[in-house]
């Protein structure tokens, strides 16, 4: 139950990996912009998910903390 708050951390790590891919050589500016935009979108998703999870976990409503993000992002 307490480890569900780590989900946003894993999402953040995915966005950091994408950010590192933007530093590869021989890429066009268009590809770099697309990768960075995708990384920032994933970062924003992690922030929203972290706030929702921590809000509901602090009230002891784990089922809502998992159910609402799943319904929102479908």
From Swiss-Prot:
Q: Give an example GO cellular component term for this record.
A: plasma membrane
Q: How does it sit in the membrane?
A: Multi-pass membrane protein
Coarse class of the primary localization is membrane
Q: Which UniProt keywords apply?
A: Cell membrane, Membrane, Transmembrane, Transmembrane helix
Q: Which domain of life is it from?
A: Bacteria
Effect of a null allele = Not essential, it can be deleted.
Official protein name in the record: Uncharacterized protein MG131
Q: Which organism is it from?
A: Mycoplasma genitalium (strain ATCC 33530 / DSM 19775 / NCTC 10195 / G37) (Mycoplasmoides genitalium)
Q: What is the lineage of its organism?
A: Bacteria, Bacillati, Mycoplasmatota, Mycoplasmoidales, Mycoplasmoidaceae
